[in-house]
C-alpha cells in the first residue's frame, strides 16, 4: 500500500496576467527544480519581450532549503535575463523556440544535460506546429552547448515529440515524452499519447513504446523517488484556449517500485488535484502542466507547475484593469502563471 499525495496551498510565482514576470520576460512556464551543487535551481522556459522562447535558470541562495518563493533568475549586470544558450541558428530544427527544460545530473561519465522541446517554426499550436526533443550539455566551465540535431522526433502520423521527462537509470537513461500530431489549437480536442524510450548514453534512444494511451490523454509527467518507491505525476496539458467541452484537468499520481517503462508495473492513476473544483485559484483554473517535485530538508514535498488562467479575452481583461486603474496585461491569446504548492500525503491507494 502507498499513500496518495494531495496538492495544497497553491501559490503563483510569475504571472502573465498580473504582470509579475521578471524584467525582460512576458511569461515563464514548465519549471524543473533540482538541487545542483550547493543550491536549488529552477530551469524554466521563458517568452522574452523580444518574442523569443528561450531556456532560463533561477536559483535560491546557496545553502538554503528549497521553497516556493525567493527564486532569482540569472541575469546580466544590467538585470536582463540570461538564457542558457543563444538562440538556435535560423533554419535549424528548433529555430522557432526552446521549451520545457528537463535537467539531468552527470551520469555514467556524461556531463549534466538539459533536455527540451524544440519548435521548428513560428506556430506555437494548431496544425503546422511541430516539435522535437533536443539536448544541451554542460561544459567544464559551467556553460551549456546545444546539440545540432534532435534526439527524439515524431512519426509521420504523429509528427511532434515534446515534453521530455528524463531520469538516469542503472543501465543509462529513460525518457517519457508526448507524442502528438501537434500542439492543440483553438476549438480542437487533445490527441495526446505518452511514450517511453531507453538509451545507454542519453543521445541514441530505443524505439519508443506507448506508456499512456490517447484515451487517457496525459500531456506530460514528472517522477520522484521516496521511501516507498517511485511516484509519477501526470498532467493533461491545460485548456489553453477555453474550449468547451474539454477533458477534465488537474494532476494524477501513480506508484511503482522502480521507474519502470512498463505501464503494468505502475498503480492505476489517482487524481490528486482537480482544477475544476470551485475553490481552485483563477491562475490555474484551466488546468496545470509541467510538474516538478522537490523534497525539503524535513522530508516535505513541493510540486512546481504552470497553470493556465481561467481568463476572459485580452480585451475584457484589459478593460477591467483599466477601469480599476491598473496596467492592462500583455496582449496574449491565453495567460500562464508558474507557481507551486505543497504535496501532502493523504489517504491510502492500493497497488
Language-model-detected regions and their locations in the chain:
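Beta-rich carbohydrate-recognition and catalytic domains
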Residues: 1-96, 104-162, 167-219, 225-284, ...
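Intrinsically disordered, low-complexity, Lys/Arg-biased terminal tails
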Residues: 286-288
